[in-house]
A protein has these predicted regions:
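Conserved helicase motor core of P-loop NTPases
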Residues: 1-106
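C-terminal accessory regions
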Residues: 110-180
Length: 180
């Protein structure tokens, strides 16, 4: 009984379909790991199993559109209430409030992961593990989808379960060091 397993797939679409199934059904049902505790990693942003493609597939499967669920387009991405997102720039001046208390502070940092709790007009409210931040439209470039993130962005983070999409990355990224 090992908690590590390797699944070979012939092409990137088969790999993406398998990753979606692992997150949506197999790991939650067989290992009791909820989808929100599974992090998908990829060595690259582009290509079939890059984070851009994986994030679109995972959002469609794990957080599809629904009536009453707020959405906000930014560039090529549609942010949706319930999405997992990552702060991708240090912002020492952003105000956060601790959920359920009157505590507040300043600063969110590159690599912080949260969940969009609400989208009200142009404002997106994100919960970073109890620290709630409101993003105005001019701040949305500080957020990226985080259902899947690059191995580089995940360095130093801990997750209950990790799925590594290592199929079609650039040769210099497809090394043992990526697993480390």
């Amino acid at each position: 009984d090992s908690d590590f397993f390797f699944l070979a797939r012939r092409d990137s679409q088969m790999a993406v379909d398998t990753i979606v199934d692992l997150c949506r059904r197999r790991l939650p049902e067989r290992m009791g790991i909820p989808a929100d505790q599974i992090q998908v990693l990829s060595p690259t942003r582009r290509r079939g199993t890059g984070t851009a493609n994986l994030n679109q597939a995972l959002q469609a499967a794990l957080n599809p559109p629904a009536e009453g669920k707020g959405e906000r387009r930014f560039g090529d991405w549609i942010f949706r209430a319930g999405d997992r997102v990552m702060q991708v720039k240090n912002n020492y001046d952003i105000l956060w409030r601790e959920q359920g208390t009157s505590n507040a502070g300043m600063g969110m940092f590159n690599g912080d992961i949260g969940v969009i709790r609400a989208i009200d007009g142009d404002c997106i409210t994100v919960d970073f593990d109890g620290k709630v931040v409101e993003y105005a439209p001019d701040m949305l470039n500080e957020l990226e989808p985080a259902f899947a993130v690059t191995v580089h962005k995940a360095q130093g983070s801990e997750y209950r379960a990790v799925i590594l999409a290592a199929l079609d990355g650039a040769p210099m990224l497809m090394t043992r060091g990526v697993l480390y």
